[in-house]
Design a protein with these regions (language model features):
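Acidic/polar-rich alpha-helix caps and helix-coil junctions
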Residues: 1-178
């Protein structure tokens, strides 16, 4: 059943599944929105100064302006702007939230959580979904456990391959992989 959970990113607007009409659309390797968000994140983490935070917010706002939604400002809120506190942690939260929305379904969330060292918090425990076999709306909207995940701290790093270890006797395996 159609439920609104399918993402149509990277699918041509001319594609019509009901009529078995699929249009070609070239793959996207790296989007401008991702570049803007990467740059904004790097700026914010680089230096805790107002001018740097303003520049970071400027790049987040470019994405929001393109989408036609309100932008962020350290000034007053109005019809076009949302006031935010002028500090590094607030801007960090904004950038991370914007990444989650803008890059939804593009396969970057896992690496984001690893880079931010938040994977253990976010990826451990029961994962829930909707009851897909529900025959009506009431049955469908029942949170249903579908997976129990375990995120081991070792997953923050990849192990060094044994062939590389064999080439250099001074090379030591990373923590958790010994």
């Amino acid at each position: 059943p159609q439920n609104g959970y399918l993402i149509r990113k990277r699918v041509s607007r001319k594609t019509n599944v009901k009529e078995n009409n699929y249009q070609y659309r070239p793959g996207i390797v790296y989007r401008l929105g991702e570049a803007f968000l990467n740059y904004a994140e790097a700026l914010n983490e680089y230096k805790d100064e107002r001018t740097v935070r303003e520049e970071a917010l400027n790049y987040v706002n470019k994405i929001r302006t393109r989408a036609g939604i309100r932008t962020y400002t350290f000034g007053n809120s109005d019809a076009q702007n949302i006031h935010v506190d002028d500090n590094q942690e607030t801007v960090r939260k904004i950038i991370r939230a914007e990444r989650r929305v803008e890059l939804c379904g593009e396969g970057v969330r896992y690496d984001d959580l690893r880079r931010w060292k938040e994977a253990e918090k976010k990826l451990n425990g029961d994962m829930y979904g909707m009851n897909y076999s529900g025959k009506d709306a009431e049955a469908f909207y029942v949170r249903t456990p579908y997976q129990k995940r375990v995120y081991n701290p070792a997953y923050y790093w990849f192990p060094i391959h044994q062939s590389e270890m064999d080439k250099n006797e001074n090379l030591r395996q990373l923590p958790f992989w010994r």
